[in-house]
């Protein structure tokens, strides 16, 4: 299902707030992932030997920021472009990494829950069910693109 103009506006409005503190929001995203699914830390080499989210881990900080920024920026561009705007090499890499790490639907659902939780916490009183639906739809479209590449 394509994003509506209103959903696109909600994504962009919230992204304006989120991008003001990508380091904090990206670490929060990973904290929520590990909280919801502690076993998921074994997917990330830089978290395997840790019992908590090491906020001073430079590899985690860098990776988390890239993931968070990529998801959010891609989500805000979906309606305008009509699809995820990843180039072919990026898409192949995303498919390959997710396939290699045996990422399945439950993993994607944990990520979605963590993403929505992170955004809701950051947006505070500006959060709405409509905003949540917009982010859910955008995330689902991005994941569908990755899953399609995983099958190739």
From Swiss-Prot:
Compartments where located: Cytoplasm; Nucleus
UniProt lineage: Eukaryota, Viridiplantae, Streptophyta, Embryophyta, Tracheophyta
Record-listed heme b binding positions: 45, 59, 63, 93, 98
Sequence motif Homodimerization, residues: 35-39, 105-117
Subunit-level organization: Homodimer.
UniProt keyword Iron-sulfur present: no
Enzyme Commission designation: 1.7.2.-
InterPro entries given in the database record: Globin, Globin-like_sf, Globin/Proto, Leghaemoglobin-like, Leghaemoglobin_Fe_BS
GO molecular function: heme binding; metal ion binding; oxidoreductase activity; oxygen binding; oxygen carrier activity
Expressed in which tissues: Root nodules.
Cofactor binding mode and count: Binds 1 heme group per subunit.
The family this protein is said to belong to: Belongs to the plant globin family.
EC top class, as a word: oxidoreductase
Reactions performed catalytically: Fe(III)-heme b-[protein] + nitric oxide + H2O = Fe(II)-heme b-[protein] + nitrite + 2 H(+)
Keywords linked to the UniProt accession: Cytoplasm, Heme, Iron, Metal-binding, Nitrogen fixation, Nucleus, Oxidoreductase, Oxygen transport, Transport
Keyword Iron carried by entry: yes
Name recorded for this polypeptide: Anaerobic nitrite reductase HBI
Cofactor: heme b
A GO cellular component entry from the record: cytoplasm
Domain (Globin): residue spans on this chain: 2-151
Function: Phytoglobin that reduces nitrite to nitric oxide (NO) under anoxic conditions (e.g. during flooding or in waterlogged soil) and upon root nodulation. Required for general plant development and during nodulation, especially for the onset of symbiosis. Monitors nitric oxide (NO) levels during early phase of the nitrogen-fixing symbiosis and buffers oxygen in functioning nodules. May not function as an oxygen storage or transport protein. Has an unusually high affinity for O(2) through a hexacoordinate heme iron because of a very low dissociation constant.
